[in-house]
């Protein structure tokens, strides 16, 4: 896929010159370890080839932002710091992580891949400190401050197994599955309608009874997860978090 990825990214960057185009390369280990976790022999080498080409492309496409992403799971939680250090040679514009979760779309339900709370806690603390210590300015400083809070939020969710702050999935965020199904999020993955059946009009689904029922379930805290996509929207709608982030940005911490 290297040629196809580079060609399409180049085209997107060219046609959207006033937008930042972000691309995440997901790496869960170094070399063979990454291949073993992903179950795809040779994936590391192909990823490196793609990354090298993208870094070269970035020289002529300044609006391209390249990020390295690691999914923290039971398979790599014990040596995360080694993996983190081992990926720095790639010199990404940013480095992010997410907690591994059992998801229908990834066919990982029942696999028990979520990291143990005690194993993830020091990882979260390390990542929060790294985010806060990065010498960035402007909107990047705000992004890093929210990122630092996200890692702490994820840690608490794993320990407490409940919504630490209110979840607005199904209101502030949603998920469109490849077949057109609308989910409140990719963790519950409960279809509330299909865009193909409404001529791609979201409104009948969004304001329908099935979505309302799912929203109530979420409001009643019948689920909890540390999924990044929903968590960032939730933090933006949580005044105490926004206030803390604002103070950190002002104080430069």
List PLM regions with ranges.
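Distinct, well-ordered alpha-helical segments
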Residues: 2-11, 80-84
């Amino acid at each position: 896929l290297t040629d196809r990825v580079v060609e399409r990214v180049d085209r997107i960057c060219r046609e959207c010159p006033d937008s930042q185009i972000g691309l995440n390369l997901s790496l869960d280990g170094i070399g063979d370890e990454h291949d073993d976790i992903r179950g795809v022999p040779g994936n590391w080498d192909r990823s490196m080839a793609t990354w090298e080409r993208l870094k070269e492309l970035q020289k002529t496409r300044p609006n391209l932002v390249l990020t390295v992403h690691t999914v923290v799971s039971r398979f790599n939680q014990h040596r995360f710091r080694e993996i983190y250090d081992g990926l720095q040679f790639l010199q990404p514009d940013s480095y992010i992580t997410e907690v591994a979760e059992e998801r229908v779309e990834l066919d990982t339900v029942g696999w028990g891949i979520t990291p143990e709370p005690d194993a993830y806690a020091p990882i979260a603390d390390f990542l929060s400190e790294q985010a806060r210590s990065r010498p960035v300015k402007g909107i990047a400083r705000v992004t890093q401050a929210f990122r630092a809070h996200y890692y702490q939020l994820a840690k608490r969710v794993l320990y407490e197994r409940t919504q630490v702050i209110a979840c607005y999935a199904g209101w502030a965020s949603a998920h469109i599955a490849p077949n057109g199904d609308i989910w409140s999020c990719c963790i519950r993955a409960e279809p509330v309608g299909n865009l193909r059946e409404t001529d791609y009009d979201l409104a009948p689904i969004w304001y329908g009874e099935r979505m309302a029922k799912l929203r109530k379930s979420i409001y009643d805290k019948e689920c909890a997860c540390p999924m990044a996509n929903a968590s960032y929207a939730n933090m933006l709608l949580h005044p105490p978090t926004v206030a803390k982030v604002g103070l950190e940005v002002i104080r430069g911490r």
